[in-house]
Amino acid sequence: MNAIEALLFAVIQGVSELFPVSSLGHGVLIPDWLHWSINRTHPDFLPFMVMLHLGTAAALLIYFRRDWVDLIGGWLKAGGRASNPHARLMWLVIAGTLPAGLLGLLLEKQLRALFASTTAVLVFLALNGLLLLWGDKLKKKTASHELSELSFAGAIKIGAGQALALLPGFSRSGATLVAGLAHGLDYASSARFSFLLATPIITAAGLLEIPKLAHRGNGSAEWGLLLACGAVSGLCAYASTWFLMRYFKKTEIESLRPFGFYCLLVGVVGLLFKLV
């Protein structure tokens, strides 16, 4: 990748990680369609992706900083017990994070290697679109609840939905948004919980790879460019979070429809072009 491609990839990562349209899917499709020379096995690609993940994680931590201060403070004040609203929500986040974290550690490399072709991505992206459209229908059939009313079993099920993102084309935020709607949350509460769940997963994805970088020596990575890409990814992720939280608060009817139709259109049209 040259510098321009790297910066554009950072924009794609920062935006599509939070929008329910699959960052991994777009990270496969767009470079392929634009004929970018990306070698994912090159030693420089790992530090590049680490910086993008850390940039996105930093954006989420900054945007939800008050939430995290309240959650951690409430949890510590309660001595780890779910005896106040903040401590209880902290436990809900922990319960929702564990399933995806464990599945990611066990299956991530195998699944991503198995389904890394553009054809597989297009199929999963179209299915992601159908999932989002189904989520809107679920919302019409379920009464809206506050996040404080979510059960621990519900949090675990919503968190498990993140595992769908191991398949390139399915969206982490999309799956958790739909799962939240299925458990009676409104769009805004579902989005907030989705982003709170994503924060430790995305942060861990970056931090767990850092020790591997120490064994690569200085290499040929241009660290100035890597830092710039991390910053670009973070800025785009922050802007995306800001937009989406306001969008879901204001749009309480069929909020997922635009994203669902977009994924379905790209997936189906992309598959048709492959057949022609």
UniProtKB/Swiss-Prot annotation:
**In the record, what terms sit under GO molecular function?**
undecaprenyl-diphosphatase activity
Where does the record place it? Cell inner membrane
Keywords attached to this entry? Antibiotic resistance, Cell inner membrane, Cell membrane, Cell shape, Cell wall biogenesis/degradation, Hydrolase, Membrane, Peptidoglycan synthesis, Transmembrane, Transmembrane helix
Which BP terms in the Gene Ontology apply to this protein? cell wall organization; peptidoglycan biosynthetic process; regulation of cell shape; response to antibiotic
Q: Which GO terms describe its cellular component?
A: plasma membrane
Q: What is this entry's stated membrane topology?
A: Multi-pass membrane protein
Membrane-spanning residues where? 4-24, 44-64, 87-107, 114-134, 150-170, 193-213, 225-245, 256-276
The EC number(s) attached to this protein equal 3.6.1.27
Q: Does the keyword DNA repair apply?
A: no
Reaction catalyzed: di-trans,octa-cis-undecaprenyl diphosphate + H2O = di-trans,octa-cis-undecaprenyl phosphate + phosphate + H(+)
Say yes or no: keyword DNA damage present: no
Note in the entry: Bacitracin is thought to be involved in the inhibition of peptidoglycan synthesis by sequestering undecaprenyl diphosphate, thereby reducing the pool of lipid carrier available.
- Functional description taken from the UniProt entry: Catalyzes the dephosphorylation of undecaprenyl diphosphate (UPP). Confers resistance to bacitracin.
> Which PANTHER family does this one have?
UNDECAPRENYL-DIPHOSPHATASE
Q: Which family does it belong to?
A: Belongs to the UppP family.
This protein's name: Undecaprenyl-diphosphatase 2
Question: What gene is this protein a product of?
Answer: uppP2
